[in-house]
Amino acid sequence: MLVKICGVARPEDVALLDGLVDYIGFIVEPSSPRSVEPRRLGELVRLVRESRPVLVTASLPPAEAVDLAASLGIPVVQHHGSLGDGHFSYAEERGVALAPVAVYRRGADLRAAVSQLLSKPHEYVLVDAEKGSRERYEGGLKIPLQALAEVAHMGKVALAGGITPENAHLVAALRPYMVDVASGVESSPGVKDPGKVKALLRALGRLSG
């Protein structure tokens, strides 16, 4: 099971996570408290030696996000907006992989949404809760465990949505391709907590002791 920690905004957090997790996500999104300006993004990405950096955005036009990633040597763009076939082709031309996002909405067909995205060229497909959703399910997860279980084994699917060290065992039991955590390992927005990171990795079976 792979692990991505998202919303990394400080050099010391890059140092903490590099090589410990598989993906490090950097958010370029003005509305996010974890957002990193493009200039600082380049400085942070240069510190990554072992993990795979990801540019995460919703409001940047897909081609612009791909261009920014390519210019900084970031191999993956996780885009929370709508992606057309042309965006996937353009990313491929620029040597950047896309990670599209399927959003859980009560009553909608999550499996169909994930299946459609998996049919496109992808680094992984992220399953996440709606932004700002206050719904809480088992253990504080933002997506029902049953819904996660239905998509966990469909392919390169990453599960997100309220995952913390305390509930990570519920998600780990589904044996997904990857889990994606941001606020669940923070002491404050954009500040990763080393103790919480290690507790998460222990809950996911990635660290012993």
UniProtKB/Swiss-Prot annotation:
Record-level GO BP terms: L-tryptophan biosynthetic process
Keywords: Amino-acid biosynthesis, Aromatic amino acid biosynthesis, Isomerase, Tryptophan biosynthesis
Record carries keyword DNA repair: no
InterPro entries in the record: Aldolase_TIM, PRAI_dom, RibuloseP-bd_barrel, TrpF_fam
One GO molecular-function entry: phosphoribosylanthranilate isomerase activity
Keyword Transmembrane tagged: no
Gene3D superfamilies found in the cross-reference section: Aldolase class I (3.20.20.70)
Main enzyme class: isomerase
UniProt pathway: Amino-acid biosynthesis; L-tryptophan biosynthesis; L-tryptophan from chorismate: step 3/5
E.C. numbers: 5.3.1.24
Catalytic activity: N-(5-phospho-beta-D-ribosyl)anthranilate = 1-(2-carboxyphenylamino)-1-deoxy-D-ribulose 5-phosphate
Xref: HAMAP family: PRAI (MF_00135)
Family: Belongs to the TrpF family.
Protein name stated in the entry: N-(5'-phosphoribosyl)anthranilate isomerase
Biological classification of the source: Archaea, Thermoproteota, Thermoprotei, Thermoproteales, Thermoproteaceae
